[in-house]
Amino acid sequence: MSITEKFGDNADLLWQSFINKEGLTPTQAHQFEQYLCMLRDWNEKVNLTRILDIPDIIAYHFQDSMQIVHHVDFTKLRGVCDIGSGAGFPGIPLKILYPDVPFILLEVNNKKVAFLESVIEQLGLTNIMVSNLDWRTFLRQTSHTIDLFMARASLQVDELIRVFKPVSPYKHAQMVYWASQHWQPGPQEEPFLVARKTYSVGDQQRSYAFFSDQKPQ
């Protein structure tokens, strides 16, 4: 069954444009299609997202998750953690792009955990796990190999920067926060902010805020 048969007229052209623009392999394109279908199906029983139109899912979920690759070389990462993964953004799209990089999806909502685990199984993703620990417990009780933490529409920055506390096993990792164009750091966050990068998604301007325990020289 084609995308048009599933989602209506013009969906095929839109989907092919997405595949071409992002340079997806046939396997990756199929995984994104499976993910799209599961997102729509599960949303009827689990509140995953308010964004359900195909163009908006592509722009504001898939591509918004994927644009970080223009600023981070994922091929060099030994481990990535998606904080407050929710319906899997940005973790699942990035895992599809980089199947060999280990990922942890951090999510406390049991229904969303079930969805994420089902997506991982259906898409055949490997070297990826879902953790239902809250953020503070994760920092206290785990010691995974993680180079990059990602937070998109989850916790506030003053909570996220707990990762840089002296007792944290992840204090030397990098953190990237999906921010609005007008977001400004508070006095707690400012010492850890090392870079801001702006980007466009759909008709919106947004930015990435990069944090580290060491300022660049």
Task: Write out the residue ranges for each language-model feature.
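Conserved class I S-adenosyl-L-methionine
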Residues: 76-86
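Generic detector of well-ordered alpha-helical packing
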Residues: 65, 83, 108-109
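Conserved SAM-binding loop of SAM-dependent methyltransferases across substrates and taxa
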Residues: 87-100
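Class I SAM-dependent transferase core
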Residues: 2-77, 112, 118-128
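S-adenosylmethionine
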Residues: 100, 104, 108-217
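Mobile beta-alpha loop/short-helix "lid" or hinge segments that flank ligand
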Residues: 36, 87-90, 133
